[in-house]
Amino acid sequence: MEPAGPCGFCPTGEAQPARYTCPRCNVPYCSLRCYRAHGSCAEEFYRDQVLGELRGRSASPSRLATALRRLRQQRETEDEPGDAGLRPGPAPGGLSGLWERLAPAEKVAFERLLSRGEAGRLLPPWRPWWWGRGAGPRLLEELGDAPSGDAEELEPSPARMPPEPVRDEPAAVEQVLGDLPGACPPAVPTRIPALASLSRGRTSPLVRFQLPNVLFAYAHTLALYHGGDEALLSDFCATLLGVSGALGAQQVFASAEEALQAAAHVLEAGEHPPGPLGTRGAMREAARILLGEGPANQKSYTLAALGDLAQTLGRARKQAVAPEERDRLYRARKKCQFLLSWTNENEDALTPLALDCATAHRAHTVAAEDVAALTGELEQLWGGPLPPARRTLIEELPG
């Protein structure tokens, strides 16, 4: 049944009969042109419905919510309102109506993606802002002396970031890889206080080892949340502080390897989803950030990342209600500001830290390859993924 009355968005005296209804406020409209004039209202409706549904799920809901931003791009290329996911008559039933229209196999496939934390495969790959143009050759030059091919492991490759497709998933949910442009780099803070103004005594030499831990968590969280979403700011910061012991628990590390292992252990223990990077990928991205734009301005990326973190934590603190959460976010923000001042005055320490990250990345890669090779040999010996049942060699017969 079509909505009664004229379109609510046509110019006065030119109103056409209404054929569609806004799903949020039920205002009638006649065409795609009028819908676009009222598009923000419809976007908010679908956004609220999707976020409300996904907040109850534990498998990376934020990266699915990011797909809402792509709806605007899709609508700009559509010719008919029906193609934009709208239908004549009353407002649609939201996610529940869409879910009911899925086939049983499609429902099972989608639930499997959520349970495995792989729903991000439905989205295009996200390109980090620190993947600047020509980064590959410069990284190879900077880490050319790194042992065991660490330099080659750090060469950017957009296709590496998304997880590998699962073989038993339908083709409809396989991700289409693309070379998307990266987000604009966050601005480096214009005013960075002197380190002496933040600390009365001598700065500990162990401060430097907190950077790999913080940047590991930063790269992991950005990739997991597909660049971040203001509506999920609280979730973003909870993941960030959960992965980074330096920010979330004021942890101190004796080496870069220990700092990276602490963050990697959080992911390997299943406390947070591994995301598209995994532990090795986050180590690799931490090294890239530490290397910066080049020898002439190496600290630029690290300063931009720490400044971005300080601003993000500040916004989250304003939204937080619980005193404990506000205090935790405040301390994490202060830590980022301290590291910002330290980095600004200790640029020479960044290259050794980047090499430590590259070495740790290579060690994890070799260990993973060894485990995969051993697993393959055992499965070949067993004839499957599980060992065969034990056979009874001697059995006592009843007397």
Swiss-Prot record:
Residues binding Zn(2+) 2 are: C22, C25, H38, C41
Task: Give one Pfam hit by family name.
Answer: zf-HIT
N-acetylmethionine occurs at which residues? Answer: M1
Asked if the keyword Iron-sulfur belongs to this entry, the reply reads no
Question: Record's CDD domains?
Answer: zf-HIT_ZNHIT2-3 (cd23024)
- Binding residue positions for Zn(2+) 1: C7, C10, C30, C34
Annotated keywords? Acetylation, Metal-binding, Zinc, Zinc-finger
PROSITE patterns, from UniProt? ZF_HIT
Q: Is the keyword Nucleotide-binding in the record?
A: no
Disordered: annotated span: 71-97, 141-166
Q: Per its UniProt record, what InterPro entries does this chain match?
A: Znf_HIT, ZNHIT2
Query: Where are the annotated HIT-type zinc-finger regions?
Result: 7-41
Q: List the disulfide bonds.
A: none
A single Gene Ontology MF term assigned here is:
zinc ion binding
Q: What is known about its subunit structure?
A: Interacts (via HIT-type zinc finger) with RUVBL2 in the presence of ATP or ADP; shows a stronger interaction in the presence of ADP.
State what this protein does. Answer: May act as a bridging factor mediating the interaction between the R2TP/Prefoldin-like (R2TP/PFDL) complex and U5 small nuclear ribonucleoprotein (U5 snRNP). Required for the interaction of R2TP complex subunit RPAP3 and prefoldin-like subunit URI1 with U5 snRNP proteins EFTUD2 and PRPF8. May play a role in regulating the composition of the U5 snRNP complex.
Question: Per its record, how is this protein called by name?
Answer: Zinc finger HIT domain-containing protein 2
